[in-house]
């Protein structure tokens, strides 16, 4: 079975948690796109839901699939967010942001009663850090922000190269919010929660891709089927 087919399996399993009348956060990325497409099929069959997209790309996909959309300005809470992840550890802490939507993804996840992460089994890791950690930053004062981030890595016992993410045109990738992204190649993060706490207050850091304590359930698709992991 292909990796794409496994992603679709995980998305289909998450769809079982969706009930009529729910307010849903719609994630970004290849696996989340499968969920949006499958949700669209259910909507066309009569399911009544409303979604909040986490990126302009997801907004376009949801509109194409006929899913009614709204914003967090019109809703105080969401019932459920379904999103993918770049890495998932045994505590269901995540690295996200490979698709560049980490800021909106975290806002939507934090506004949800429950977050389900869907992925193929290759995203399950013993510890976070092999996937480059995205850090969304304001372009102004970039060198000063980079130095402060590097100091935070040292305090957290992590080290590695930071590079500005580039788009297909070779220029700096620009997020939906107009920011840039550092991708930090750390290899291993000894304590993800500690590092998150060090990054949060840095001036110039808008958000980072460490999602600590937000996911409640992970659905991992593999050759043997779907493995459901709930946060301890």
Curated annotation (Swiss-Prot):
Coiled-coil region(s): none
EC nos: 5.3.1.6
Enzyme class: isomerase
Catalysis performed (reactions): aldehydo-D-ribose 5-phosphate = D-ribulose 5-phosphate
Pfam families listed in its UniProt record: Rib_5-P_isom_A (PF06026)
SUPFAM superfamilies assigned: D-ribose-5-phosphate isomerase (RpiA), lid domain, NagB/RpiA/CoA transferase-like
Pathway the protein acts in: Carbohydrate degradation; pentose phosphate pathway; D-ribose 5-phosphate from D-ribulose 5-phosphate (non-oxidative stage): step 1/1
Gene Ontology molecular functions: ribose-5-phosphate isomerase activity
Gene3D superfamilies for this protein: 3.30.70.260, 3.40.50.1360
Keywords: Isomerase
Active site: 105 (proton acceptor)
Binding partners and assembly: Homodimer.
NCBIfam families noted in UniProt: PRK00702.1, rpiA
Family the entry assigns: Belongs to the ribose 5-phosphate isomerase family.
Protein name per UniProt: Ribose-5-phosphate isomerase A
Organism of derivation: Nitrobacter hamburgensis (strain DSM 10229 / NCIMB 13809 / X14)
Lineage of the species this protein comes from: Bacteria, Pseudomonadati, Pseudomonadota, Alphaproteobacteria, Hyphomicrobiales
